[in-house]
């Protein structure tokens, strides 16, 4: 293999996407219009909601879809694909339509976060990568948002590159963490590529390279006098590290009139050490010195530290964020929901399972979110058939699609359609926002959720309801396929 060849993401697909596509071609079904939804079934960490992320990379992937000569040669060498199909792939481009929720949107189980309408082969071949990028980044953005909410307004930085599961895991993970609310990253290339603010302090190796900790601190502050952060736990945090930091601040920063500085702890009892360090710094007149901590943090440890009164201004969160260690899989799936017949009529499709939670919602659909006009808070999400509209000037009865006797009348509300057009006829029609805009949007949308939905433990179930028309179509399909 030519290692200088740029990775062609078109071939980043499960092999059965290609065998099915060859089969569609052999059956003359390659141009049949299909509809697929991406959705997930459970929120990671038993949370109340997830955060959508990864759309920008999905857009770039779709724009670049093509098979080159090396790809065709490889497929021909497998002796499984017809020559006519391989010639078809030579001219392959995406010509379909895509709708998706914007990145940073809070999302809930069993509602579509992306819908693809395209000829059968096109829709089939994009499955793997779309799931890959949306699953990964939504997972990390969701975890980051949990961590950021646990920090209660304190700065959170993503520190996980060296523990990430591969290069893309680090680079795109930092991007997703920023969407979820982290203020920056230690991953330099994520700043270069996406504008995620990169920063860092020093490692223990810097301190060990000098004859004394004081000399290491003094040298560092002389090189970087603007807001330096010193790692104080290389030897003895309270007896040596903090006193050496105070001495350095007094000798290097104070004469220059500089007050912004910080210390970082990466080991030990963070509650005890930060309380003691805070008092030492304050007594020395360095109330402006920020205390940062790292070391295998997650939302639960951060919450416990703050409940115990730890004096912490900033958290550096690494492995448990970048790998979403507590639940490292986001279970997004890609399911066929409808096809078009020769006359252009949309025929709903359903996937049935003995596991009720795996039964799909059929048809080409719209997704609405209802907001209370008096509170601005999200009330429920509402799935309906593509040709339905919601008139929010009138009361609307909604019901639990599984326990249909549970009903509620929604009034004084605003209905907002969540899915927006991304591609039409293979052309990008969506203006991609900046990463900072996505982060701000995410924070604003999370604020529309009730605190009960945002609980870490046993959150309130946020309802995703079906319109009566959609529920009836689903019920009819279930009855037809159970006879």
Residue ranges and their predicted role:
Residues 1-33, 42-44, 80, 86-95, ...:
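Buried, small/hydrophobic-residue-enriched core segments of structured protein domains
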Residues 2-32, 36, 45-47, 52, ...:
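Gly/Ser/Thr/Ala-enriched C-terminal appendages of enzymes
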Residues 34-90, 99:
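N-terminal, Lys/Arg-enriched amphipathic/low-complexity engagement segments
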Residues 57, 139, 434-438:
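Short amphipathic alpha-helical segments
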Residues 73-74, 142-146, 160, 454-461:
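Short coil/turn segments at secondary-structure boundaries
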Residues 78-86, 166, 394-402:
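Short, positively charged
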Residues 199, 263, 291, 313-315:
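Hydrophobic residues within beta-strands of alpha/beta enzymes
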Residues 204, 294, 318:
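Residue-level "edge-of-site" marker
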């Amino acid at each position: 293999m030519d290692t200088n060849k740029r990775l062609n993401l078109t071939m980043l697909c499960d092999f059965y996407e290609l065998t099915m596509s060859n089969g569609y071609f052999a059956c003359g079904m390659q141009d049949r219009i299909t509809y697929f939804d991406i959705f997930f079934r459970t929120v990671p960490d038993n949370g109340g909601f997830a955060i959508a992320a990864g759309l920008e990379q999905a857009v770039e992937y779709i724009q670049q879809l093509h098979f080159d000569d090396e790809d065709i040669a490889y497929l021909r060498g497998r002796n499984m694909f017809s020559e006519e199909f391989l010639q078809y792939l030579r001219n392959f481009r995406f010509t379909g339509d895509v709708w998706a929720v914007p990145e940073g949107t809070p999302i809930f189980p069993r509602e579509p976060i992306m819908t693809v309408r395209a000829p059968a082969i096109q829709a089939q071949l994009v499955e793997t990568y779309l799931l890959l990028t949306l699953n990964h980044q939504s997972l990390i953005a969701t975890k980051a948002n949990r961590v950021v909410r646990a920090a209660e307004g304190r700065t959170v930085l993503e520190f996980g590159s060296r523990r990430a599961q591969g290069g893309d895991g680090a680079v795109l993970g930092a991007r997703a963490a920023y969407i979820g609310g982290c203020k920056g990253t230690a991953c330099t290339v994520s700043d270069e590529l996406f504008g995620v603010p990169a920063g860092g302090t020093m490692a223990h190796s810097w301190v060990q390279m000098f004859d004394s900790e004081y000399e290491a601190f003094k040298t560092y502050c002389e090189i970087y006098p603007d807001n330096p952060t010193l790692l104080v736990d290389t030897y003895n945090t309270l007896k040596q590290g903090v006193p050496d930091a105070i001495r350095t601040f007094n000798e290097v920063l104070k004469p220059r009139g500089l007050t912004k500085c910080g210390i970082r702890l990466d080991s030990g009892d963070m509650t005890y050490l930060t309380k003691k360090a805070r008092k030492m710094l304050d007594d020395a007149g360095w109330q402006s010195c920020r205390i940062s901590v790292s070391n295998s943090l997650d939302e639960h440890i951060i919450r416990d530290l703050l409940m115990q009164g730890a004096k912490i201004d900033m958290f550096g969160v690494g492995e448990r964020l970048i790998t979403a260690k507590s639940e490292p899989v986001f279970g997004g799936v890609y399911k066929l929901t409808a096809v078009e017949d020769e006359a252009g009529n949309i025929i709903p499709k359903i996937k049935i399972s003995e596991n009720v939670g795996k039964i799909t919602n059929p048809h080409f659909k719209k997704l609405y979110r209802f907001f209370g006009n008096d509170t601005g808070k999200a009330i429920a999400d509402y799935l309906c058939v593509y040709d339905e509209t919601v008139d929010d000037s009138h009361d609307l009865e909604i019901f639990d699609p599984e326990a249909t006797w549970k009903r509620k009348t929604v009034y004084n509300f605003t209905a907002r359609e969540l899915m927006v057009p991304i591609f039409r006829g293979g052309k990008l029609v969506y203006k991609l926002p900046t990463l900072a805009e996505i982060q701000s949007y995410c924070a604003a949308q999370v604020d529309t959720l009730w605190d009960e939905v945002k609980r870490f433990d046993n959150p309130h179930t946020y309802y995703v309801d079906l319109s009566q028309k959609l529920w009836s179509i689903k019920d009819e399909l279930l009855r037809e396929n159970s006879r």
